[in-house]
Each structure stands twice: as structure tokens, then as C-alpha cells.
Amino acid sequence: MTRIRRSPCLLLLIIWFMCIAGSVQVVQSQNQTGATTHPDEARALNSIFAAWKIQAPREWNISGELCSGAAIDASVLDSNPAYNPLIKCDCSFQNSTICRITNIKVYAIDVVGPIPPELWTLTYLTNLNLGQNVLTGSLPPAIGNLTRMQWMTFGINALSGPVPKEIGLLTDLRLLGISSNNFSGSIPDEIGRCTKLQQMYIDSSGLSGRIPLSFANLVQLEQAWIADLEVTDQIPDFIGDWTKLTTLRIIGTGLSGPIPSSFSNLTSLTELRLGDISSGSSSLDFIKDMKSLSVLVLRNNNLTGTIPSTIGEHSSLRQVDLSFNKLHGPIPASLFNLSQLTHLFLGNNTLNGSFPTQKTQSLRNVDVSYNDLSGSLPSWVSLPSLKLNLVANNFTLEGLDNRVLPGLNCLQKNFPCNRGKGIYSDFSINCGGPEKRSVTGALFEREDEDFGPASFFVSAGQRWAASSVGLFAGSSNNIYIATSQSQFVNTLDSELFQSARLSASSVRYYGLGLENGGYTVTLQFAEIQILGSTSTTWKGLGRRRFDIYVQGRLVEKDFDVRRTAGDSTVRAVQRVYKANVSENHLEVHLFWAGKGTCCIPIQGAYGPLISAVSATPDFTPTVANKPPSKGKNRTGTIVGVIVGVGLLSILAGVVMFTIRKRRKRYTDDEELLGMDVKPYIFTYSELKSATQDFDPSNKLGEGGFGPVYKGNLNDGRVVAVKLLSVGSRQGKGQFVAEIVAISSVLHRNLVKLYGCCFEGEHRMLVYEYLPNGSLDQALFGDKTLHLDWSTRYEICLGVARGLVYLHEEASVRIVHRDVKASNILLDSRLVPQISDFGLAKLYDDKKTHISTRVAGTIGYLAPEYAMRGHLTEKTDVYAFGVVALELVSGRPNSDENLEEEKKYLLEWAWNLHEKSRDIELIDDKLTDFNMEEAKRMIGIALLCTQTSHALRPPMSRVVAMLSGDVEIGDVTSKPGYVSDWRFDDTTGSSLSGFQIKDTTGYSMSLVAPGSEISPRDSDFKPMLGSKINEGR
């Protein structure tokens, strides 16, 4: 073969020809039409880019002409990442002399600020992609000008306010993306006019309410994401008419079941994700004809019935998740024979029978934890590279090699290892990281196993264990451990927070073989995957939310690590809970209920995250707290067992005798014994001893119904004993109601009830003792605490969250009626807990109450309650607003020692607001504070204290405003303060019959407690069955 020798001259000649050809192509791109950009659109685009501080690249801005180069080159696609920002033009106007801008892409380049109004003048736009920036402000009604729009996305930004109804004018729209923003208000009905929509992404948008009936018109939809939204009502039946759907996600909403039978029409689906349906049971019948499915996720939906054997006919399935339901019966063998199935999650059901004896080679991840499966395990469980979670079943493990699934014997039903014999008194785990010793000397054991989508682990010595399940949606590289090199500002154990365990669904930690008794459980967190939202990048716009259970009790709902850390990613968060171990077993469960964003900063950035778990005893341990020696002194062991059994028998007899005696003592107290939730019953002698016979030196204060004493129980716990005085007006009925109320609501921002005493004439409540006293003592007392701004803001947020729980989340709805600074207690870490439910009233959703006996404290009373006895949750909202002003100003709601215009805090706050001098309210003692947060708190306080209760926001919206998730609305009316109260001090006085006059001059006389209407008929009557004015 003849070879051609290339000379340098020849190479130069080739290069020259290439350059000429390239130049000709550029000139052609620039001049092939001779058209120019419409001058109005050129000015508009230049203004937009100037406002966003970005420039038009030379590739489509040749010689200053916008519609040139790549902007008119059909070979350059919008999706090409090399061209960003990018516009596209249509130069066919006015005999091909004028170009109109039809496409704009400004994607993921961290543009910060509002959308310039000039954008809405570009009426020839058909494609607008502004996703993954930090755009703020609202979408204006002028969006309706873009009537040619077909593909429009604002996904992953910080846009707020309502979505304008004018979006319904975009009737040619094919794609709408508004996910992962801070919008507020309801989903616009007008979107239903966009009948050509093929893709709709409204997940994590902040919208709420109902899915509009007009959405029944969206029959062209092919993809719909409706997730992480506070929407209500049942899943609409009309979704079954969206028969062109290939992808449907409805996760983490407030929608209730059952799943409509019309869903069986969705036979084109390839991906179906339904999750966290709140009520209503459904079967799996509706999936029968969905033969194109490759992803089927029906997690946490109250599914009942059996798994049909016909599921084996869905040959395209790659992932199946039916976990956290109520399915029963055997597992069909056909499910394990699906040739493309790689991930199978069946955990937390009541499936029974044996494990299928065969599986396909593709199936590498299987979760069947928390079921009733039994029998021997098949041989394939020993295959390498499998991820299996078989925890909490009834498998027979005899003959199983110890190297296969090590520790599974400890994690079968009832967790048998060391059950009935406490050998440990604590445990500490560095979740996702290596062994670390804390500054206090505690050794946090390593937990850096590759859990993957389904796994469990038991520590050496069987002191603790872990179990995790879940597959991150959309992630090609599922990572279950996060790491960081950050140094954390509020802890000496910074290294402990540089790793964290991640889970896409559920992760549990167990303490095994613990000595029975009370424990303090400490959970440590730091958000090391999602950046802080104060960063100037879209990667800081994510929100992670999950639930936390300790010993099966929900202690945190929608817990957000970063928000709790004050929006900081270098601030550690610690949560402390009390737990009782009665069967040598402790469980901490972190569960994702579909809330939070899914894809910021990466696909699959959601679900539980935790840095460390530890538990320490609240009593003096009697065990060695180390693994037992093996094979020594067998005789001693046998003797010990016999003696132990004998002693236990004697002890059991004593306990049974005591219980029977106590029950006999209380047989006449039918109300107490008939309660659904029974707190621990203390004896009078126990509490008398704990308080040193109610020694005056242990007195903490005097409440509305009697004194409160500090006490030390025999198990080492420090408590606050509320002793109801003989003269207290709180009768037996109200006492029982209070016990029921407090026992049924558990939240970190509500004071914890340990138990009660109801013995003869002695009636007492025993609470957790909070060492830092009350908020009014901290702010106004003789020995004030130094509360810096961030602490005050967290206290305000904590109180708001506690009230949200009382009003909207507790199993029984509660209006506190006496929210005030002295009823907000501070724990050792200055976390607020709302106390004193002695004035609380139980009520059903959407009920109200008119009472002639008004209970509360002057200065915190809402006008409609003080003057008319009209009680709703907005009564508490008003009082919260007053507390918020006290936190900002550092002064009580009234102070007779100040000049006239400043005597009454709320009146002074309004006067300053009218003069735009709100910041003068801020406490002079605060030398360093966040001005934006201070203004926010003042604005919220004024919203909460408006005269009309209908104008006050619900507490859930208050939390959203405090958290910065939604903007603060305008205050439209003067605060509802009541002037000319006849009193000397409003900081502690309880209302008890006096004359008041409101700002309109209306005067009335309040009925003193018990003076005209008996408590039995009025005040003590639960508000069940009456009507609430305020709808939710």
C-alpha cells in the first residue's frame, strides 16, 4: 500500500482551508437571512440580561446582533449544554427581515433576583426555561401575555406568592414546570384550561388546597408529578381519565384513599409512584392491566388484601415497592421470577408463609422485613452481592452458616437476643462513620457498612443493631453515606458530624439487651448534603423532611435538620428524648413520608439523615455494661438462673399485689380508669418524698390552680409537681380531661407529662422539670438569661410549631387559651415547651365554642374571646403574636413605668408600624441580630394580632412564614388590642370578672368564674359537637 508523506506545507494548507470554511459558515449563520432582531425585543432582552448580570455569548450575538449564530442555527439544540444562556429566533417575519425571540434558556447558572417585567413583553416566546436558579419574587398576571407559550419551566427556584390565574390563558401549553419553589395559595383552577398539557410538574411547589376539578380536562397528560404538597380531599377519580399517562407520581400529599378503581384505565403507565395516602384502604386489583409498568411504587398506602399471583405477568417490572401497607398472605413465587426485576420491597406488611425457593439472577435487592414469614431460608440467600433485609420475621435459622446473614438471629420477631436479661446500660453509634470518641469520653462505635437499598447490621457483642431499606428515585448512583469536611460551630465533636447515614425510605437503630428503665435518647444531626438556602446557588434550595419515632412514639413530624439549625449547614443539631425500656429493647426509627424536595442538589437527595445515635440511663445501672463472658462457670449460670427465676416470681407476686391494691383504691374513680391513654400513676407518698414534704424551698411558683414544686424521684429523674390546691376551681372532670389531653399529645415543643396522682383529695400532675424556667423569667425576671437573637428566633419558631401540633396535628385538637410568656418553659438547651394545659379545651376539627366563662391572661386575650367568649384556635394565634412582640422587644406586653405611648406593647408596635419605624421595637440589649428576621417576626406578630380572627393566619402558615418558606402578607387591619383594662399588671394576671372597653367603645361586663353559670354546664364542657367558625 502506498503511503502519503505529509509535509508541513501541506498541513498548513489544510488548516487554512478549514479556517476559510469555518469563516464562511459563520458568515452564513450571521447573514443568511439579513434579518435583524425586533428592536423592542432586543431592548427587552438586553434589560433582562443586565438585571441578571449575564451576557449574551458570542456564539449567538455575532457583531452585536442577537438573532444570529446559534440563535438561528437549527443544528444547535436547546438541550446542548455548551450553549447557556441561549435564545432562539424565528426570522420569518415581515418578509424575513425581522426576527422574533421564540426561546430563552437561562438554566442552572445561579441567576439571583426577581424576573424582570420585560420578560412578559416577549409575546412570541414558545419555550422558556429558567430552571435551577435563585429567582425570587412572584409571577405576575402579565404571564398571561405569553399566549404562544408551549414549554415553560421555573422549576427549582425561590419564587413565592400565588400562581396567577392568568396562566390559564396559555392554552397552547404542553409543559408546565413550577416544582421546588415557595409558592403559596391554592392550585389555580385555570390550569385546567391548558388542555394540551402533556407534562405537569407541580411537586414541592408550596401550593395547597384541592386538586381542581378542572384538571379533568387534562386528558393529554403524559407525565404528572404531584408530590410534597399540602392538598386535601380524596384522590380524584378523574385521574383515571388521563389514559395517555406514562409517568404518575402522587407522593407525600394530604390526599386520602381509596385509590380510585378508574386507575385501572392507566394502561400506558411505565412508572407509577403512589405514596403516603392518609386513609382509606385499597387492593392491588387496579394494576392488573398495567402490563407496561417498569417501576411500581405503592408505599405507605393502606393497601389490603393479597399480592396477586398475576403480578408475574408484568414482565417489564424492574422495581416493586409495596412496603408499609397491610398486605397479607403468601409471597407469590411468580414475583421472584420476573426476569427484569432488580429491587423488591415488601417490608412492614403481614405477609406469611415461606420465602420463595427460587429467584431470577437479576433480583439483587430484597426487603421483606417486619412480616410474619417463617420456615427455612432458601439456599440462594448465601449468594454474593445480594442485599437482603429479613429483620422481624419468624424464620428458622438452624443450620444457617454464621457467615451468612450474621446477627439475623438477634433481629427476628420480638428481637430475642438478650431479651429478658439486661446486660448493657448504654450504646453510642457514629452513623455512617468510623469509631469516634467524644470530648466527654463516650465511644461512638463505627457504623459505616454499605447498607445499600436493603440491609441490616448487628454490632459485635450484640449491643446494638441497624436496619435500612429504600431506593433513591431517579438516582443512577445510590449513595447511603454522606461525608463532609466541614467544621461545625456549636459542638466540640465536629468529626462526629462529618459523616451521616442516608436512607431513601426507613432506617432503624436498636439497642439490644438494655437494662430495663428510663433512658435519655440523643440523636445528632447535621445537614451535610443540601447546602444552606442563604447560598447564592440553586443547590441550596432543597428541603429534607422526615419523621422520627422513639419506641414507636412519634416525636418529630416533618423534621427539617437545616431549618432547625437556623438554615446553617455548619451547625450541629441535637435532639433529646425520654424513652422507657421494658423488654430490654430500644428502637429509634427515622421514616420518610414523602415530604421535601426530591432532587436538590442531586437526584435522590431526600429521606432520613442522621449523624449519631446514643442512649444513656436515667437510673443507676446494676449491670456490667459489657459483653458476657462465654463458656465459663456454667454451674454458676444455672444457679443464677434458678435464683433469678425465684426472685422474679416473688417480685411478680409483690407487683401484682400492689397493682391490685392500687386498682381497688381507685375503683371509685371511674373517669380516670376509663381513659384510653393512661399516664403513670404516682402515689402520694412518692411525691411527698420527692418534694421533701412539699418543702417551700422546692417551690417553683404558683399556677392558676395551685403551687408547683421541684422533686427528685427515686429513679433519679427531676420533676415538676403541680399540686392542685383545695381551693382550686379545677374539678375532677377537668382534671381527668387535662390528663387525657396531655397524655395524647407528644411533641418536642410541648411540656412532657410523666404521670399523675389521684389519691383521695390529692390531685397532682408530674411534669418533666425544665431547668431554665419560663420565658417571662428569662426575658423580664430579676435573673434574666442572656437570650441572643438566634435563640429568640428559635424560641419563637418552637412555640409556633408546638401550637401547630395542638391545633392541626394532634389526635385531639386543642385550643390552649392561655398562651403567654410564663406558660412557655425552657429546657437546658433553651428549647421552648408550652406548658399548662389546665385551661386547654378539646375540640373536633371545624368546631367552635361560645363560653360565658373566659379564662386567660390579660394582655394576651383576643378581643372576640375577651368580649364575647368566642373561642377558636385564632385565640391562640393572637396570644402568640403578643409573645412574638415580647421576644423582639425584650419587654412585657405592658409596663406602667414607661411613658404613655409605650405602656402597651401592641399599641406601641402598631403606632411604630404606621410610621414605618418598626425596628425601634427591637430590644436595645440585642447588639447583634438579623434585621430581616426581626422585621419578619414583627410583621408576623402584627398579622397574628389583627382585630378580625378571620384575618389571622393559622399557625401552620406562621411556621412557614417564620421559616422563610412563604412571604409575609400585608397587615390589613389595626391590631385587636383592648385599651382601658382596669388592672395594674398584665404580665401574670388571669382574667376574672372585670370591665373592659375595646377600641370601638364597646363595653361589656365579663362573668366571673362560677358566678352565674356553673362550671359543669359551661366551662368544663368539652367542645365536642359544637361548631367552629374557622375552616381549616
UniProtKB/Swiss-Prot annotation:
Q: Does the keyword Nucleotidyltransferase apply?
A: no
UniProt keyword Secreted present: no
| Molecular-function GO term, any one | protein serine kinase activity
- What ranges does the Extracellular topological domain annotation cover? 30-636
Q: How does it sit in the membrane?
A: Single-pass type I membrane protein
Q: Which residues carry this modification: Phosphothreonine?
A: 683, 852, 857
- Its primary localisation, in coarse terms, equals membrane
Q: What is its EC number?
A: 2.7.11.1
Q: Where Phosphoserine occurs, residue numbers?
A: 822, 851
**Which residues are named in the active-site annotation?**
818
The record's Gene Ontology cellular component field reads: plasma membrane
Q: List the catalysed reactions.
A: L-seryl-[protein] + ATP = O-phospho-L-seryl-[protein] + ADP + H(+); L-threonyl-[protein] + ATP = O-phospho-L-threonyl-[protein] + ADP + H(+)
Q: Which residues are glycosylated?
A: 31, 61, 95, 145, 182, 265, 302, 337, 348, 352, 394, 580, 633
Query: Which residue ranges traverse the bilayer?
Result: 637-657
Q: Where is the signal peptide?
A: 1-29
Compartment annotation: Cell membrane
| Positions of modified residues (Phosphotyrosine) | 767, 865
Name the PANTHER family on file. LEUCINE-RICH REPEAT-CONTAINING PROTEIN DDB_G0281931-RELATED, PROTEIN KINASE DOMAIN-CONTAINING PROTEIN
Q: What family name appears in the similarity comment?
A: Belongs to the protein kinase superfamily. Ser/Thr protein kinase family.
According to UniProt, the name of this protein is Probable LRR receptor-like serine/threonine-protein kinase At1g56130
